[in-house]
Every structure is written in C-alpha cells, then in structure tokens.
A protein has these predicted regions:
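Bacterial Sec-dependent N-terminal signal peptides
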Residues: 1-23
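Glycoside hydrolase catalytic-domain context in secreted enzymes
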Residues: 20-218
Length: 218
C-alpha cells in the first residue's frame, strides 16, 4: 500500500508543471524522493483518499501540502474536454479543441518524427484544458475488423505500433502531460467488452499484444 501511495504522489509531483508556460519535468528518481518527503506530512485520511478514484477523471491530492489534484481528460484523436470535471480555478479552459487525424492514419505515415510532433501537440492541448494526464494513446493491435475502436489504434503490426507509440509518448510527455496507455490487453471488441473473455496464448501475448505497450513505457 505504501508503494502504491508513493507512486501516486510521485506521478502527481512529476506532472505539476501543466499549468506553467513551459514544462519543467523532474526525473522519476527526483519525484520519488520528493514524494517520500511529502508522504511524511500526510494524514491517514489523505493517504486513503489517494488509493481510489474520486468521480471520473479525477484523483484527489492535498494542495495545502504541495500535492496537486490530478485531472485527466479522455482522448483518441485529440482532447475530449469535460468541463464539469475540471477545476475552474486552475486555468481558463478552452471551449473547443483540435480534431486530429485518427491514430490509424498516423500509423500509416510510418513517420516517427510526425508521431512525436502529434503527441506534443496533443500534450499542449491537454495542458490548456487544465489537465495533467491524457488517457491515451489507444494502442491495441488491429486483429479484427469488428473492433469498434480500430480507428484509435496504431495498426496490426506490433513493431510499427511500438515505434509510433514510443515517439507519441515522448512528444506528449515533453510538455509535462502524462500519457496513459490503453486499453491493456487484447481489447479487440466493443461488444460486451467488460464481460467478454479474450483467450490468448502466452506466445501471442508476448510477441503481438504487449510489445507496443512496452515501447510506450520504455
């Protein structure tokens, strides 16, 4: 439990730059060290608050003790703003955001630099929306034409998807916005997706379904 809370605090501290004009990202080691110090000053109730979600797209912090709230926005081809869930005191939220080309179109360019610039642009719009985390990119492998979210993903090739997502995440996180890779793992149908069972052997998981996620983390 302590490691879970430490990780949350470290993430919160590492993404506090989203309201500034220029991202000032600290390293993971720096954030973890600072999180350890912040954790010492939190009450038990404050620690418990950090172990669960609070409404959608929101994780409570402890602003009085230097730990900001974490606001998240959903994404596929840009930033989806939900004004009711964002803090009106943080920044002046834009009424509209850019409709970017779908991720499958980005993958079809085979252009790593473009993927990086795409992620950077989405990252800046996330910050303009007053959020620190973008719930994206979507990156499941395109295995079935029946998947209703194929347009969000980066194609059927694990290597290409990995190259695209690695550059996308690099660009996005250079702005101070944290990427949240989704939807782990083998999410290849929208029909009853919270109830269905994906039967996949270990080799397929390791060779096809997880490489892109690993690339996004590394």
């Amino acid at each position: 439990m302590k490691k879970l809370i430490l990780s949350f605090v470290a993430v919160a501290l590492a993404t506090t730059a989203f309201a500034q004009k220029k991202a000032e990202m600290m390293s993971w080691d720096e954030a973890y060290t600072k999180a350890t110090e912040v954790l010492k000053n939190l009450s038990l109730d404050e620690k418990i608050e950090m172990t669960h979600g609070h409404n959608q797209f929101f994780l409570p912090g402890a602003p009085a003790k230097g730990l900001p709230h974490i606001f998240m926005v959903d994404a596929s081809a840009g930033v989806r703003i939900n004004h009711s869930l964002l803090d009106p005191n943080e920044v002046r939220h834009p009424e509209k955001t850019t409709q970017f080309p779908a991720n499958i179109m980005l993958a079809s360019t085979f252009n790593n630099e473009l993927a990086k610039r795409y992620g950077e642009a989405v990252g800046w719009e996330t910050r303009m929306a007053g959020a620190g985390v973008l719930l994206g990119p979507g990156m499941n492998i395109y295995r079935s034409s029946q998947c209703g979210r194929n347009f969000e993903y980066l194609g059927e090739d694990p290597y290409l998807a990995g190259c695209m997502v690695a550059n996308y995440v690099t660009g996005m996180q250079s702005t101070g916005t944290m990427a949240c890779l989704k939807h782990f793992l083998a999410n290849n149908t929208e029909y009853l997706r919270r109830l269905s069972n994906s039967v996949v052997d270990e080799r397929a998981i390791m060779e096809i379904y997880t490489p892109a996620f690993k690339a996004g983390i590394d």
